[in-house]
């Protein structure tokens, strides 16, 4: 089966700079007007500009910008930023994602140092590190991911580290390199329900992602595991509940549930806007199923309030340990 990389190579170098070359020939889909509960202030505070300056100074990429996150104003104003490593070009072409698809450049061996330096300079108590998919690399970028974690530990020993990883599909043993770097939280998002994978996340496999989360717990039970789900793509309540059960069977500690927002007319269309009341209902269901931590709201994203949520996650584990002692 031809991949996005094969297609881009066949087209030549002129498409390398195109943000979404694989979506250019898709028909436009309507972009629905956001309801009141999804509207946020435009960014622009002093601390926002300071965060932006540090990111630029260290020549870093952030998923906040690349994925057009609606929470960027709030997070950057609090000097929180999610670093995106291994470049800004992804080898996948997920229908929901705003990150550029194309042929990536070589890994920058100095990136781990620069990321660690930025984390220390920002004085972060908790940092989230994510990446593009790098199917072009033999290990999917696992060693580079681990080097970033190790570098942060050295430069900012008091900072807790959360990673949001790709699935390392067909990269046997790659995830072990990342697990063994000892992040505090290992996050890998399932993103959507199995029925919608071919449409929404065609380069991935639902059960491969589920197995990845399970392998993290099997290899290092002390690490917190986390996974996220978008809603509003056409899934049913029953399907969402089944994903919750699947996550719990893999030992996932923390689930995030948020509204899918369509980046452009070429991306997957929003089926509907899930109401705040429905998100509260999902939160209650997830807690009843045994998750240590649940974040469920229209604007919930994997790294939104990650530091505060990590503290709550630790407290929840201590409380559970005390009850079962």
From Swiss-Prot:
The protein's UniProt keywords, in alphabetical order, are: 4Fe-4S, Cytoplasm, Iron, Iron-sulfur, Metal-binding, S-adenosyl-L-methionine, Transferase
The signal sequence is: none
Q: Using the UniProt record, name the top-level EC class of this enzyme in a single word.
A: transferase
Q: What are the names of the required cofactors?
A: [4Fe-4S] cluster
Instruction: Please give the Gene Ontology molecular function terms for this protein.
Output: 4 iron, 4 sulfur cluster binding; lipoate synthase activity; metal ion binding
Q: Which CDD domains match?
A: Radical_SAM (cd01335)
Q: Which residues form a coiled coil?
A: none
Against InterPro entries, the record matches this protein to: Aldolase_TIM, Elp3/MiaA/NifB-like_rSAM, LIAS_N, Lipoyl_synth, rSAM
A cellular component term from Gene Ontology for this protein is:
cytoplasm
Show the ranges annotated as biased composition (Basic and acidic residues). 8-33
User: Which positions in this protein are listed as binding [4Fe-4S] cluster 1?
Assistant: 64, 69, 75, 303
Could you tell me which PROSITE patterns the record lists for this protein? RADICAL_SAM
Belongs to which family?
Belongs to the radical SAM superfamily. Lipoyl synthase family.
Instruction: Show the PANTHER family listed in the entry.
Output: LIPOYL SYNTHASE, LIPOYL SYNTHASE, MITOCHONDRIAL
Protein known as: Lipoyl synthase
Q: Which organism is it from?
A: Caulobacter vibrioides (strain NA1000 / CB15N)
């Amino acid at each position: 089966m031809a991949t996005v990389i094969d297609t881009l190579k066949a087209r030549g170098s002129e498409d390398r700079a195109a943000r979404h070359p694989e979506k250019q020939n898709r028909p436009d889909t309507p972009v629905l007007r956001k309801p009141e509960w999804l509207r946020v202030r435009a960014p622009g505070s002093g601390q926002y500009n300071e965060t932006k300056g540090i990111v630029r100074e260290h020549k870093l990429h952030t998923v906040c910008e690349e994925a057009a996150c609606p929470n960027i104003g709030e997070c950057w104003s609090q000097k929180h930023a999610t670093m995106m490593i291994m470049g800004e070009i992804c080898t996948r072409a997920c229908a929901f994602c705003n990150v550029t698809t194309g042929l990536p450049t070589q890994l920058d061996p100095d990136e781990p140092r620069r990321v660690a330096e930025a984390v220390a300079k920002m004085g972060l108590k908790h940092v989230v590190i994510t990446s593009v998919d790098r199917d072009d690399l033999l290990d999917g970028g696992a060693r580079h991911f681990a080097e970033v974690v190790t570098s942060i530990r050295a430069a900012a020993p008091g900072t807790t580290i959360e990673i949001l990883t790709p699935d390392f599909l067909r990269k046997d043993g790659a995830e072990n390199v990342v697990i063994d770097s000892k992040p505090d939280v290992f996050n890998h998002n399932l993103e959507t329900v199995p029925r919608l994978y071919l449409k929404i996340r065609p380069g991935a496999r639902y059960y491969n992602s589920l197995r990845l989360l399970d392998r993290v717990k099997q290899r290092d039970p002390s690490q917190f595991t986390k996974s996220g789900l978008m809603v509003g793509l056409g899934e049913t309540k029953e399907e969402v509940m089944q994903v919750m059960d699947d996550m719990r069977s893999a030992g996932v500690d923390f689930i995030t549930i948020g509204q899918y927002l369509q980046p452009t007319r070429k991306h997957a269309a929003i089926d509907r806007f899930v109401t705040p009341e429905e998100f509260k209902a999902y939160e209650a269901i997830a807690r009843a199923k045994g998750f240590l931590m649940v974040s469920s709201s229209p604007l919930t994203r994997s790294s939104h309030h990650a530091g505060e949520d990590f503290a709550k996650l630790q407290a929840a584990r201590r409380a559970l340990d005390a009850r079962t002692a």
